[in-house]
């Protein structure tokens, strides 16, 4: 989701289908 998109900046290991 969109949340993961922001999380990936702090936690690159976390990526959602919406990320990227």
Curated annotation (Swiss-Prot):
MF term (GO), any: hormone activity
Region (Disordered): 1-20
Basic and acidic residues bias (residue ranges): 8-20
Superkingdom, taxonomy of origin: Eukaryota
Keywords: Dental caries, Hormone
Purpose of the protein: This peptide stimulates the transport of dentinal fluid, which is important for the prevention of dental caries.
Protein's recorded name: Dentinal fluid transport-stimulating peptide
Native source species: Rattus norvegicus (Rat)
């Amino acid at each position: 989701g969109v949340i993961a998109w922001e999380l990936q900046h702090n936690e690159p290991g976390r990526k959602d289908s919406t990320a990227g």
